[in-house]
Amino acid sequence: MLVVGMSHRSAPVALLERLSMDDSVRGQTTSALVERPSLSEALIVSTCNRLEVYTVTSSFHTGVNDVVEVLHEISGVDIETLRGYLYVRYADAAAEHMLVVASGLDSMVVGEQQIIGQVRTAYQQATEAGTVGPALHALAQTALHTGKRVHTETDIDEAGASMVSFAIDRALTQMGIDPASDKPLAGKTALVLGAGAMSSLAATHLGREGVDKLIMANRTRERAERLASHSLEAGVPAEVVDFADRASVLDRVDMVVSATGADDFTVKPADIPAGVQLMLVDLSMPRDIDDACAEVPGVDLVNIERLHRAKREDPTGAAAEGADALAIVREELEAFTSEQRIRDVVPAVSALRKRANELLLDELDRLQARTPDISQEDWKEVTRTVRRVMDKFLHEPTVRVKKLAARSGSVSYESALQELFGLEAVQTTAPPAITSVNASDLPDAGIVAIVNSPSTTGQSVSVDGS
């Protein structure tokens, strides 16, 4: 298992913007990934705050390099730039990362619920595209189950925090309004551009904050009308304007929230009437609103980049909020990795039984050739007896090897033999040879930065293979 990605923690927004993928590009990219001989499965999580490629690879070095090359080919970002900002997690560390992400623990707003839906969508799309196999099926389902447990069994999202609420609270603060006050948007009108998930969340949150009126605009007018009807049902007055006429209402609103993912800017400086006091909130990646709008007198702007900056300056509460959630992640990760280790040992057990059966048949053929006068009844009894001995001899190690595989860490060859065959420990006077070492005794090698550095011992090595 391998994950190669970048997020708000590792990369500037401008670079995340260049790597942002819509559904079409994401499908194209996963297909390109599994065409590489080293990669057998692929799933991509692409949001405004992260781009992560989850894969199953037959070779760590080759797999990482193949992922980086595909990202370069799809995005046009040069490989050296990618190397400077991408992070890599491998094996159990990769599995843990998806569980942490799906639980909202790696989000800019810790505990936000949108990410679990985004992981689910990524999984569904990759499944439909045929780029997900047994390993990623098991991992994605475990991650979604873990995320659900975190949100139902802890208080991590008690405050209902999300990227949308964080952005609007930030906008209110910049407007000189206390977000914690009762109905802080009372007497205000807001324009919502777009009618997707983010826009719907924004409209709902604006309604809860007491906005007097919402104006909706979307390229497909019917979707804007549907969103407006939901607002009306919630008791918030709403109207719809054609998307092409959105600039005509800017002198009537106090706030604009844009989440369209459009190719062109939805709001430009030339669209803004002179003398207005206007708060612009851009929730899109790539960005919807031209940064130059913030230079217009009376206009302020909140966007993903500015939210990142604000969160870095005030990262409060993350550790306390995530303690209980991390305990759930650890529990689910242990169960997942145990199941994977058991699954991985099954082919070896099958091969052992197959080989034992082949040897048994060979020996029976040899015995039959050497005892031609043995009666048919006696031969059947010999065959049954030999097969019973083989089955009894293999039964215990077959059961025990699965239990042994389920444990984390490693054991010595001597201990493995004793465990598999139920043997009593043999006391020796000579010091035992060192045949294994626990991963916990080594430096943490589950996380690798993609840099041109010397090779390291363990799970991780430098990307350039030096």
From Swiss-Prot:
Q: What does the entry give for GO biological process?
A: protoporphyrinogen IX biosynthetic process from glutamate
* Binding positions (NADP(+)): 194-199
**Which enzyme class, named as a word?**
oxidoreductase
Cystine pairings recorded for this chain: none
Q: Which domain of life is it from?
A: Bacteria
Q: Where is the active site?
A: 48
Where does this protein act, in terms of pathway? Porphyrin-containing compound metabolism; protoporphyrin-IX biosynthesis; 5-aminolevulinate from L-glutamyl-tRNA(Glu): step 1/2
Q: Does the keyword Repeat apply?
A: no
Catalytic activity, EC: 1.2.1.70
Instruction: Give binding positions for substrate.
Output: 47-50, 107, 112-114, 118
Recorded hits in SUPFAM superfamilies, A to Z, give: Glutamyl tRNA-reductase catalytic, N-terminal domain, Glutamyl tRNA-reductase dimerization domain, NAD(P)-binding Rossmann-fold domains
Q: Which reaction does it catalyse?
A: (S)-4-amino-5-oxopentanoate + tRNA(Glu) + NADP(+) = L-glutamyl-tRNA(Glu) + NADPH + H(+)
Keywords of this entry: NADP, Oxidoreductase, Porphyrin biosynthesis
In this chain, the site described as Important for activity is at 97
Q: Does the keyword NADP apply?
A: yes
Read off the Pfam families from this record: GlutR_dimer (PF00745), GlutR_N (PF05201), Shikimate_DH (PF01488)
User: What are the GO MF terms of this UniProt record?
Assistant: glutamyl-tRNA reductase activity; NADP binding
| Its biological purpose | Catalyzes the NADPH-dependent reduction of glutamyl-tRNA(Glu) to glutamate 1-semialdehyde (GSA).
NCBIfam families, alphabetically?
Answer: hemA, PRK00045.1-3
Instruction: Show the domain comment.
Output: Possesses an unusual extended V-shaped dimeric structure with each monomer consisting of three distinct domains arranged along a curved 'spinal' alpha-helix. The N-terminal catalytic domain specifically recognizes the glutamate moiety of the substrate. The second domain is the NADPH-binding domain, and the third C-terminal domain is responsible for dimerization.
Other known facts: During catalysis, the active site Cys acts as a nucleophile attacking the alpha-carbonyl group of tRNA-bound glutamate with the formation of a thioester intermediate between enzyme and glutamate, and the concomitant release of tRNA(Glu). The thioester intermediate is finally reduced by direct hydride transfer from NADPH, to form the product GSA.
Subunit details for this protein?
Answer: Homodimer.
Into which family does the record put it?
Answer: Belongs to the glutamyl-tRNA reductase family.
This protein is called what? Glutamyl-tRNA reductase
Which species does this protein come from? Corynebacterium efficiens (strain DSM 44549 / YS-314 / AJ 12310 / JCM 11189 / NBRC 100395)
Gene encoding the protein: hemA
